[in-house]
Amino acid sequence: MSTYIIEHLEPKLWKWCIIEYKHISHMVGKQNLWITNLKKGSKELQKYGKVIKMSVVQVPLSKVCVLDPDAHKMLTPADAKKFDYFIFGGILGNDPPQKRTGPELTSLFTYPIETRNIGSKQMSTDNAVAVVQKIVNGKRFEQLPFQDGIEIDLKEGESIMFPYRYLLKDGKPLVSEELMEYLKKKKGI
């Protein structure tokens, strides 16, 4: 069974991060999720997975794959046998992308790792995990349905655009209901 590791790279633990990590936990199971690099807020996240305060680059692991959009190879179902750990940068992406995964995560490992990409478009962390889980379970990237960009209605006459790539589940973009409710209630988006 694969372990999915989210290296928290945001300056603090935002409410939307907690919602996203909870969504990931529901998808892959608490026993298969690690959240690393958390200085504060780790107690709240323990119900969703294993929480490690230090960076994943300080945890000695083998059979590691870092998901990096700049990786030269795409993740394939055959990689499921090669890797035990799939590591994701928990970063709120910018549009256009700032290419933070390499300098803030991939380049910091002192032990051997391999990198893979899941396409050239930026995804939310929960969507990236869902895509990797599908590929590890036998689907090729090319077989997965996606939608680029979504608009979420907040209230009458007000909406928010997310320019990221979303996996389609039952024909709809994979977005946590809890996140949508949070965005609708949040002031000052």
Segments (PLM) and residue ranges:
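Histidine-anchored nucleotide/phosphate-binding helix
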Residues: 13-28
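Short, surface-exposed basic-aromatic patches at helix termini and helix-loop junctions that form
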Residues: 23-26, 79-81, 103-112
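S-adenosyl-L-methionine/SAH cofactor-binding core of RNA-modifying enzymes
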Residues: 29-97
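Structured adenosyl-cofactor binding patch, chiefly the S-adenosyl-L-methionine
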Residues: 103-152
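A short, charged/proline- and glycine-enriched loop
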Residues: 1-3, 62-63
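C-terminal accessory extensions appended to soluble enzyme cores
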Residues: 49, 55, 133, 137-189
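Short, glycine-rich nucleotide/cofactor-binding loops
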Residues: 4-16
